Curated annotation (Swiss-Prot):
Tagged with keyword tRNA processing: no
Similarity comment: family membership: Belongs to the PEP-utilizing enzyme family.
Disulfide bonds: none
Catalyzed reactions: L-histidyl-[protein] + phosphoenolpyruvate = N(pros)-phospho-L-histidyl-[protein] + pyruvate
UniProt key word Magnesium: yes
UniProt: Mg(2+) binding residues: E433, D457
Residue ranges of the TM segments: none
Residues at the active site: H191 (tele-phosphohistidine intermediate), C504 (proton donor)
Entry protein name: Phosphoenolpyruvate-protein phosphotransferase
GO cellular component, one term: cytoplasm
Amino acid sequence: MSKLIKGIAASDGVAIAKAYLLVEPDLTFDKNEKVTDVEGEVAKFNSAIEASKVELTKIRNNAEVQLGADKAAIFDAHLLVLDDPELIQPIQDKIKNENANAATALTDVTTQFVTIFESMDNEYMKERAADIRDVSKRVLSHILGVELPNPSMIDESVVIVGNDLTPSDTAQLNKEFVQGFATNIGGRTSHSAIMSRSLEIPAIVGTKSITQEVKQGDMIIVDGLNGDVIVNPTEDELIAYQDKRERYFADKKELQKLRDADTVTVDGVHAELAANIGTPNDLPGVIENGAQGIGLYRTEFLYMGRDQMPTEEEQFEAYKEVLEAMDGKRVVVRTLDIGGDKELSYLNLPEEMNPFLGYRAIRLCLAQQDIFRPQLRALLRASVYGKLNIMFPMVATINEFREAKAILLEEKENLKNEGHDISDDIELGIMVEIPATAALADVFAKEVDFFSIGTNDLIQYTLAADRMSERVSYLYQPYNPSILRLVKQVIEASHKEGKWTGMCGEMAGDETAIPLLLGLGLDEFSMSATSILKARRQINGLSKNEMTELANRAVDCATQEEVIELVNNYVK
């Protein structure tokens, strides 16, 4: 008899294969064992660190090839952990001062760090706790001489089942053999979920108990479309899901026909579908999926996973590569958005009680112009290689925009005096992420060339709900009428001044939100490249006039639930 296990759909698709249980290695040891050869034990620890660096470097290089530089940056962060004296020194001191064995010293110190980071109300710090756990496990395995599971050695078709997949586990998956995976823990924003989407393999996370309910070699089905795992399916279920898998692949193939098609509603209104990227490595997916431009180029990945700032020349080459590849299509580059959930080890940013509302993004750049000016110079120099738009993140006041623009114009003049060619067709815009900015959209619209609505932050700031907090996640409501009204206000303000508005948050590629955004008059929808063709098909089947009527009714609703019901009744 088959068994159904529910989880969170993390990556689309249907996988059918035997279960491969990722068995946790035995990393037990005697915590109370004292050592007499202290120097030898420190050397043993140092040797484990060096061996871990060698392994992680190989994994990092493989991840860059398979997943792109932005995903590989996770392992750059792991390598930095192994070089962090604030972590390494206390471990060595514990061995020397307490005669602790290397395994005990490592786990005691890293557990303290993990506990501190996990208690912080900060997404970046919580992710760093996971990084430290992953790195600590690898170092411990070398201390104990125990081999960690290596998914890259799998040589038959399987679905991986485990408690969780670490970033290094996921980076070693071979798409040829690993058909999908299912885990006990995790969410849609966990490292493993993000990487599964990059690898385009079906994945389900957060099942709570799958490792207790599946045995090695069980036949299982992973339905990444609905979040279902079927263990030991019946013959009828097997046939049904094989059919569902074939239909899924047929649908993907059918969508490819829309790659070069226009995005136009049934009543003739055009929309622009653009892609979000982190590095030039993301360009193949952008082109394969028929993006009409890049609506968000996150430049912070150029700064992450390294121990010093990128030079102006390094930045220039990265921006030039993207602009040339897009061949005249619009590329919207967001200036450095560091702080909040993204930090740089070499900047030594002050700790803050609430970093999401603190020293970050444009605030940091205006205060530290030695960071800001080289980026602006690199962008201006690259502008002659394509259609460049520049936008500033986290702008709260018109004076911030004016100051940023003044610095850019100053650097433009400097570059011209140095003999550089600069495009005269660069549009300057801002991210609308703060409710105050949306409220003054009419004021901003007189001075900016465009808006890009960053819904991820706009939603959590408007509803005062941390989207990473399970206790208040019910308040993170993309379809709340308050959000729709702010979006409408921003779009109308831009159109009144003859300007345009895009959206680059997750909402832009959401199938429930798309009809509403189309009706509200959104000009550009920027999303993950893999969502573009589905969004194009959806928009090409909608009527702009009908969606305008829908949106007008939606902003008058009282709750998110009413909005969802309204959309479901309109769009069937």
